[in-house]
Swiss-Prot record:
Belongs to the CobS family. One of its GO terms (cellular component) is plasma membrane. The keyword Membrane applies. Keywords: Cell membrane, Cobalamin biosynthesis, Magnesium, Membrane, Transferase, Transmembrane, Transmembrane helix. It is a multi-pass membrane protein. It comes from the Archaea. InterPro entries: CobS. Joins adenosylcobinamide-GDP and alpha-ribazole to generate adenosylcobalamin (Ado-cobalamin). Also synthesizes adenosylcobalamin 5'-phosphate from adenosylcobinamide-GDP and alpha-ribazole 5'-phosphate. One of its GO terms (molecular function) is cobalamin 5'-phosphate synthase activity. NCBIfam families: cobS. The keyword Lipid biosynthesis does not apply. This is Adenosylcobinamide-GDP ribazoletransferase.
Length: 271
């Protein structure tokens, strides 16, 4: 198998629950091709969007929102949510830098991690529900708009991870440091352009607004990580995935409302 195909297979093995397998050789090839993570976001986001379109078309909104959340974690797995929990433990730990880093790396889940995880799940549900309410009120294409918004959110989530990796410094050796050390600016730029292009094609101006909000979120997570841990690890990268997805959906909800109320002169045209 060529290096590219091995990296492609590993991308989905690493970022999803699709049973394609994963190996250290594949990870070595993947970190050389960071843009494949954004490509995975496009594919996974499309799958989530299609699922959301079907549930929005045939089921009540509340049930649809819950099922969308279930499908997101069914297809993407819980690794990044677990990273958010570890990040919460580290960020809320009191004491020295060493204690914070130890809490970040600790395999057990504390009250800080539980709180961050629960709040993130509540926020994800709230963001999906708010998006549903706005598009149902303003548009006859509600299911399509929700599907496209979820696509952009997933692309943004994956680009947020690459942003943290590209601009952060590792605090210890491991899988996270492999990704961080190999996410060079040229590789990051390729993934950034790929993600931006798809978001613009899918949702016009609103697409790029949502995408940029994910990048901004990543820099906020990076800043918090540096303040607490003096660097980043894989948990910090995973945290950016979870938080960016939520922020993109919230920003798109606000932007869609503004557009439909006639503010800002923004226009969007779903494909």
């Amino acid at each position: 198998m060529s290096g590219f195909l091995l990296a492609l297979r590993t991308t989905f093995g690493f970022l999803s629950t699709i049973p394609v397998g994963m190996s250290m050789e594949g990870l070595d090839e993947l970190v050389k091709r960071s843009y494949l993570q954004t490509f995975a976001g496009i594919v996974l986001g499309s799958m989530i969007g299609i699922f959301a379109y079907l549930t929005e078309s045939f089921l009540p909104s509340t049930i649809s929102a819950v099922l969308i959340m279930v499908f997101i974690y069914y297809i993407t797995g819980l690794n990044h949510l677990d990273g958010l929990g570890d990040f919460g433990d580290g960020a809320t730990a009191h004491g020295s830098l060493e204690k914070k880093v130890n809490a970040l790396k600790d395999m057990s889940l504390g009250i800080g991690g539980v709180s961050y995880t629960v709040l993130a799940l509540i926020a994800l549900y709230a963001s999906i529900s708010s998006l549903q309410a706005e598009v149902l009120f303003f548009s006859d294409n509600a299911a399509l708009i929700i599907a496209i918004s979820l696509l952009i959110a997933e692309i943004g989530a994956k680009q947020a991870m690459l942003t943290v990796a590209a601009f952060g410094k590792p605090i210890h050796e491991g899988l996270g440091s492999m990704i961080i050390n190999n996410t060079t600016f040229p590789r990051y730029a390729v993934s950034f352009v790929l993600g931006a292009l798809v978001c613009v094609l899918a949702f016009g101006t609103l697409g790029i607004i949502g995408y940029i909000s994910a990048i901004v979120t990543a820099f906020v997570i990076l800043n918090i990580s540096i303040r607490h841990f003096k660097g980043i690890n894989g948990d910090c990268i995973g945290t950016s995935n979870e938080i960016a997805r939520i922020i993109v959906l919230m920003v798109l909800t606000v932007a869609i409302t503004a557009v439909n109320n006639g503010y800002g002169g923004l226009f969007w045209t779903p494909l």
